[in-house]
Amino acid sequence: MLKNRSVVSIEDVDIDDLNDLFDLSDSMLKTIEKGGSTDLLRNRIMATLFYEPSTRTRLSFESAMHRLGGSVITVSDVKTSSVAKGETLADTIRMASSYSDIIVIRHPLEGAARLASKFANKPVINAGDGSGQHPTQTILDLYTIKRETGSIDGKTITMVGDLRYGRTIHSLIIALSRFDVRINLVSPQILKLPEYVLTKIGDRSRIMEYDDLSKVIEDTDVLYVTRIQKERFSDQNEYQSVIGSYSVDRDLVSRMKKDAIIMHPLPRIDEIKPEVDELPQARYFKQAYYGVPVRMALIYRILGD
C-alpha cells in the first residue's frame, strides 16, 4: 500500500502497487476524457520544488493535483527563492512540509529526493534526481506499454540512446526486471548502462547490449528512445563525440513490426525525426498524455482515503 508513503525510487512501488495504479489510471483517464475533474483531494495542497527545468513532468503533476480537486503551491524559480540566499535543501523541505500535504521535487543531484524524504514529515515524490531515477515516468511508461500493446510480459524492449545518464532508463530497467521481457540496450560505449543499475537486476540473461540499432530493430516490440543528456556531461568534447549517434527515421521504422510502438520520455532533440510523428508506431505523445491520469492515480493512492 502506498498511503502516506514517499516514492523516491521505483523500488518503493511493488508489483501489486503497479497493477493497482494501472487500474486506477484507467479510471482517471475516463474522468479526463469526459472533460471532468473530481473533488477526491479537496483542501489538500501539493508543493512542487523544481531545481531543474521541466515542462511535461511539472505540468502533469500540477494538472493531476488540480483535477483531483486539490491545489498547488510552487517555487517558480529557485534562483529567486531562499535557495539563492544559501538555504539548505533540508530547511527548504522542512518549510515546504509545513505548508503542504505532499511534496514533488526535481533536483540535479542524484540522491536529493531520498535526502528530502528524510527531512520531510509529509510524503515526497521524486520527479527526477540528476542521473538517478524518475519513478513516476517509469510508472507511466509501463502503463503506456500495457495499454498500447495489451501486456508487458512477452515483449522485446529495445532502449537506445543515453543509457548512462538517462534516469528514465535506470528506473524503467529496474521495473522491467519484474516482468517476463527481453531487453536490448543500444548505446555508444561511453553511454552504456551503469553497473550499479545492473546490480539491481536479478537475471541478466534477458539483457543484451549492442552498439548497432539495426541489428535488433526487426525483433523489437517497444522501441524506447532517449536524448543524449547534454547537461550531464562535464566534458563537452565527449558530448560532441556522441551527439547524433542514433536517429529514428521513416526508413528505420519501415523495418519494425507493424504493431510495434515507439516511445520517448521527451523532450527530443534530433533522435526521432519529425517525419516519424504521423506513423502508426509513434506513441510518444500519447505516452506524455498518460502522465496526468497516472500521476492522479499515484497522488490519490498516497493522500486519499
From Swiss-Prot:
InterPro entries: Asp/Orn_carbamoyltranf_P-bd, Asp/Orn_carbamoylTrfase, Asp/Orn_carbamoylTrfase_sf, Asp_carbamoyltransf, Asp_carbamoyltransf_Asp/Orn-bd
SUPFAM superfamilies: Aspartate/ornithine carbamoyltransferase
Residues engaged in binding carbamoyl phosphate: 56-57, 106, 134, 137, 266-267
HAMAP family attached to this UniProt entry: Asp_carb_tr
Single GO MF annotation: aspartate carbamoyltransferase activity
Protein name: Aspartate carbamoyltransferase catalytic subunit
Record's subunit section: Heterooligomer of catalytic and regulatory chains.
GO BP: 'de novo' pyrimidine nucleobase biosynthetic process; 'de novo' UMP biosynthetic process; amino acid metabolic process
NCBIfam families found in the cross-reference section: asp_carb_tr, PRK00856.1
Organism: Thermoplasma acidophilum (strain ATCC 25905 / DSM 1728 / JCM 9062 / NBRC 15155 / AMRC-C165)
Function comment: Catalyzes the condensation of carbamoyl phosphate and aspartate to form carbamoyl aspartate and inorganic phosphate, the committed step in the de novo pyrimidine nucleotide biosynthesis pathway.
Gene expressing this chain: pyrB
Annotated residues for binding of L-aspartate: 85, 167, 227
Sorted UniProt keywords: Pyrimidine biosynthesis, Transferase
Catalytic activity: carbamoyl phosphate + L-aspartate = N-carbamoyl-L-aspartate + phosphate + H(+)
